[in-house]
Regions:
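Conserved pre-motif I regulatory segment
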Residues: 56-91
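Conserved Helicase C-terminal RecA-like lobe
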Residues: 93-96, 101-122, 293-317, 321-431, ...
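Conserved P-loop NTPase motor "coupling/switch" region that bridges the ATPase
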Residues: 115-117, 132, 161-162, 188, ...
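Conserved helicase motor
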Residues: 125, 146-154, 170-175, 196-202, ...
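Conserved helix-turn-beta segment of the N-terminal RecA-like "Helicase ATP-binding" lobe
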Residues: 127-150, 240-243
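Conserved helix/coil segment N-terminal to the catalytic DExD/H
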Residues: 152-186
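SF2 helicase motor core recognition
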Residues: 174-179, 228-230, 389-393, 415-419, ...
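A conserved SF2-helicase RecA2
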Residues: 457-466, 470-517
Length: 517
């Protein structure tokens, strides 16, 4: 029971064990006792450690939850859980608002003086769109910087400045680990998409482990813990709950896996329970459990163009600027020109003779793989161009991710077979589709994630594509839509699609803006 938002009151038969808490009072009530304890974060943690169940964090009543958005109940519960655990996991599904929960919890600890600086480790693709975006929408009063630069010296300078929140990518930590340790004020490390640290022999794992002290807060977040193999839990547990796993990886492997042949291992019957015990303390919300989430949650992944893409993109943009000088650009001309820019952005462009020119687009494909790793369910990937569909499919096949293609060259009977397998069988896991082939009425509810590997040129088509998964028969209740973008033209088009702006005059206006950027 919470009394006046100041004290916790509960019954006990053994009041003596609470004597270690300075701010407490024991009262005899009948044959038993009631204990009143000051409701502070430290006191709440001690009560939890003493075995008192369901001790609430003071953040639930003593925090103003700053920012544009009112927190949803599952976000409050997640933030409260984080404040009560120095090291913990958040395994909630993608699109449930883990980022905001972690930022609010961090801000609360900073207000209490328990955390001075925060280091956030995440993929490049979500440093700006997810983390910096949510900082601006919530804890805007905190100073923040993205410590990402081609030169290590510049990254080090960013660390040495007094920004309260520093965001960097996994590999970037290796360049600044010494400075982070020397600073001594990074009391909290937040790791997003934590599966990147599943292997404890990698450089990135060792870099992270090197900056942690027994007093460091560490919150690791992923929607799919140990999704590929029970052995994947080892690296994560060694960071958060080292007592929960053996000292050496081979002992963990022998505990959770059976050796079938010289090179083949299979999970033991008890592996799931062992992984669950190792990956604690943890909190998880599925999208279906988050009743206050909208039915469709949209997320953005940003990826830099490769030098090759940037070179040809800028060259083509310059040519367009010359061609447009003094001429009236029609919507048809604008659409054709922007199509070329979109093709380069996605990694495969057509020449005037319909020959395909492939560009280095490895970072974009890696971002797609990140998205797939963050959900355990099936995924639909939409790409405008056949050349890009081929590139995606080839990449997924090399990564041993079962996939099928649907586009204009696939017959109606074969499409029906592919859709039936996608809906009713374990494989394919990914369907790579051309939007034009996504006819009205097609149901693809086996997927709960829709990825746009670049923007479309029509709001109607975009809405139809989202509706393939967001329709009757969807068991997830919530669908996640992911935009992958890199170039200015993509960002402008995705913004127009999100705002449902579908006007031919927009194309000419956007064309003029793009070529003049």
């Amino acid at each position: 029971q919470i009394v006046d938002n100041k004290a916790l009151l509960f019954k006990t038969r053994n009041p003596a064990k609470y004597s270690i808490i300075p701010k407490h009072k024991v009262m005899q009530v009948g044959d038993g006792y009631e204990v009143a304890v000051y409701w502070g974060l430290d006191e709440a943690r001690v009560l939890r450690n003493l075995g008192v169940k369901d001790v609430p964090s003071p953040i639930t009543k003593r925090y103003d939850w700053p920012g544009r958005y009112k927190p949803m109940q599952h976000q409050i519960d997640t933030a409260a859980f984080l404040t009560m655990h120095r090291r913990s996991f958040v395994f909630s599904e993608p699109g449930t608002g883990k980022t905001l929960s972690a930022l609010w919890a961090a801000d609360y600890l900073m207000k209490l003086g328990k955390v001075r600086r925060v280091l956030i480790l995440c993929p490049l693709s979500i440093m700006h769109s997810a983390w910096m975006g949510d900082i601006n929408n919530s804890v805007l009063h905190r100073s923040a910087i993205i410590a990402h630069h081609p030169k290590a010296a510049r990254r080090i300078e960013m660390i040495q400045q007094d920004y309260e929140i520093v965001i960097t990518n996994y590999e970037g930590l290796g360049l600044i680990a010494d400075e982070v340790k020397a600073d001594g004020r990074f009391d909290l490390v937040i790791v997003d998409e934590a599966n990147a640290y599943k292997t404890n022999t990698t450089r990135r794992w060792k870099a992270l482990n090197s900056i942690l002290t027994p007093q460091t807060y560490l919150w690791m977040m992923t929607g799919t813990p140990a999704s590929q193999s029970p052995t994947d839990a080892y690296g994560l547990a060694k960071l958060v709950n080292p007592e929960g796993v053996p000292k050496f990886f081979t002992a963990w492997r022998d505990k959770v896996m059976n050796k079938i042949t010289m090179y083949k291992w299979a999970p033991k019957v008890t592996a799931k329970d062992d992984v669950f015990s190792a990956l604690q303390p943890a909190i998880r919300f599925t999208k279906a459990e988050c009743l206050d989430l909208p039915p469709v949650v949209t997320m953005t992944r940003e990826v830099e163009m490769t030098p090759q893409q940037a070179k040809y993109y800028n060259t083509l943009k310059t040519q367009m600027l010359v061609q447009a000088a003094g001429e009236t650009i029609t919507a048809v001309n604008a659409a054709a020109a922007m199509n070329k820019l979109l093709q380069i952005s996605c990694g495969a462009a057509y020449t005037d003779d319909r020959e395909v020119v492939e560009f280095d687009s490895a970072p974009r494909l890696s971002v797609l793989e990140e998205v797939l790793e963050e959900t355990s369910r099936k995924v639909i990937v939409f790409a405008l161009y056949l050349s890009v569909i081929e590139t995606i499919s080839t990449y997924l096949t090399k990564k041993r991710i079962a996939n099928e293609q649907i586009h204009g060259g696939v017959t109606a009977s074969k499409r029906a077979q592919i859709i039936h397998r996608f809906q009713n069988e374990p494989e394919p896991r990914v369907l790579v589709m051309q939007p034009q082939a996504s006819a009205h009425g097609i149901t693809l509810t086996a997927a709960d994630t829709v990825v746009f590997y670049g923007p479309l040129m029509s709001v109607e088509q975009y809405t139809q594509c989202c509706a393939r998964a967001d329709r009757k028969g969807q068991t997830s209740d919530k669908v996640t839509v992911v935009h992958i973008q890199s170039s200015p033209v993509e960002k402008r088009l995705f913004k127009a699609l999100s705002q449902k702006v579908d006007d031919h005059s927009l194309l000419t206006e956007m064309f003029n803006n793009v070529i003049s950027e």
